[in-house]
A protein has these predicted regions:
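PLP-dependent class I/II
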Residues: 1-204
C-alpha cells in the first residue's frame, strides 16, 4: 500500500498488481493466506485488478500442503483477479500452452490482445495438451512431478549443507523449483561468479 500511494503521488497511474503467489522465481516465496486476502482488500480499496500468475501452484511437495496454494482467484467476489497458469511446468516445457480465468468482459479483450500478438498458440501443442487432460495423464503426472522435485530439493539441500555449512542460510521451500540461498554479507556474489566461471561451475 505504501508503494501504491507513493507511485500515485508521483502522478503514475496504477491500475493492477502483478503477483506470483506460489513458489515464485527465483526466491521460491510462498504468499500466506492472510496476505492473499489482504491483496484482495487492497484491490477493492484502490480499485485495482490483480494479475495472479500461478505456474507452480500444483507443485507443492506434501499432499497435506495442498491448501497453501489456494488461488487468490478462489476468493475473488468482485471480478478483480485475472488468473493465469501454464502447462509448461506440469506437462512439458516445450508446450508453451497457458490458460486464464477472468471476468467475461476482460477475457474478450485479452483474447483480442492474444490474437494481435501471435494469432494463436500452435494447434498441435493445444491438441496434445487437450488429449493429455482428457485421458487423465496430467492427473497421473502431477503427483510424480511433486515427488521428483521434492527429491531434487532434498538433494540440493544436502549438498548445500555439506559444502557450505554455516556460510549459507535458506528457508526450506514447500514446493516449486527454487532454493534461494543467502550468503554472509562479507562474501561478494560477483567475486564468487568470477571464480565459478573459472571452475566451469553453473552459477545463478
Amino acid at each position: 500500500e505504501t508503494v501504491l500511494r507513493r507511485e500515485r503521488a508521483a502522478g503514475k497511474r496504477v491500475s493492477c498488481v502483478y503477483v506470483v503467489p506460489n513458489f515464485q522465481n527465483p526466491t521460491g516465496t510462498l504468499i500466506g493466506a492472510d496476505k492473499r486476502l489482504g491483496l484482495l482488500e487492497l484491490a477493492a480499496r484502490h480499485n485495482l485488478l490483480i494479475i495472479e500468475d500461478d505456474p507452480y501452484g500444483e507443485l507443492y511437495f506434501d499432499e497435506r500442503d495442498a491448501h497453501i496454494t489456494r488461488p487468490i482467484k478462489a476468493d475473488d467476489r468482485e471480478g478483480r483477479v485475472i488468473y493465469l497458469s501454464s502447462f509448461s511446468k506440469t506437462l512439458a516445457p516445450g508446450f508453451r500452452v497457458a490458460w486464464l480465468a477472468a471476468p467475461a468482459a476482460l477475457a474478450s479483450k485479452l483474447d483480442v490482445a492474444k490474437q494481435a500478438a501471435d494469432l494463436c498458440t500452435g494447434s498441435l501443442d493445444q491438441r496434445v495438451v487437450y488429449e493429455s487432460w482428457k485421458r487423465g495423464l496430467l492427473t497421473e503426472r502431477v503427483p510424480q512431478l511433486r515427488a521428483h522435485y521434492r527429491d531434487k530439493k532434498n538433494a540440493m539441500e544436502r549438498v548445500t549443507r555439506s559444502e557450505l555449512g554455516d556460510l549459507a542460510t535458506w528457508r526450506e521451500p514447500r514446493g516449486g523449483f527454487f532454493l534461494w540461498v543467502a550468503l554472509p554479507v562479507h562474501l561478494n556474489a560477483e567475486t564468487l561468479l568470477a571464480r565459478a566461471v573459472r571452475e566451469k561451475v553453473v552459477y545463478v
